[in-house]
A protein has these predicted regions:
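Active-site rim/loop-helix segments in enzyme catalytic domains that contact anionic ligands
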Residues: 1-98
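Active-site adenylate/phosphate-handling loop in enzymes that bind or generate adenylated species
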Residues: 93-115
Length: 115
């Protein structure tokens, strides 16, 4: 199971490892806290339109390596709060999927926007 904040975090982080694990027979599930609705260059799009695009892109990228399940929690991009509600959602997905390994992003890594 991979838990990340945004679509494309996995592709920039651990998709190669996930591809190898899937080729070796593992089942991988992605859990995305947001749908990346604020992280799109076309400012004419509504958040809902951006969300649909980002999710479609993530679905396509995951399909390339054989990921069969993606869970979108759809918290507002850029406004995620580490609260009890989020933790309950994450625990629910972990209990449901029962992964042997949970992969996440490095909490000390900082993304610097080029915009």
């Amino acid at each position: 199971m991979v838990i990340v904040a945004h679509p494309d975090d996995i592709e920039f982080g651990c998709a190669g490892t996930m591809a190898r694990w899937i080729q070796a027979g593992a089942t991988v599930c992605y859990v995305l806290v947001t749908s990346g609705d604020a992280g799109i260059a076309d400012l004419s799009l509504s958040r809902e339109e951006a969300m649909a695009i980002r999710e479609k892109e993530q679905d396509a990228a995951a399909a390339v390596i054989g990921v069969q399940e993606i869970v979108y929690l759809r918290h507002p991009d850029g406004m995620v709060v580490n609260d009890l509600a989020l933790r309950k959602q994450l625990v629910r997905e972990i209990r449901r999927f029962q992964p042997e390994v949970v992969v996440g992003m490095d909490p000390t890594a900082v993304f610097i926007s080029e915009n």
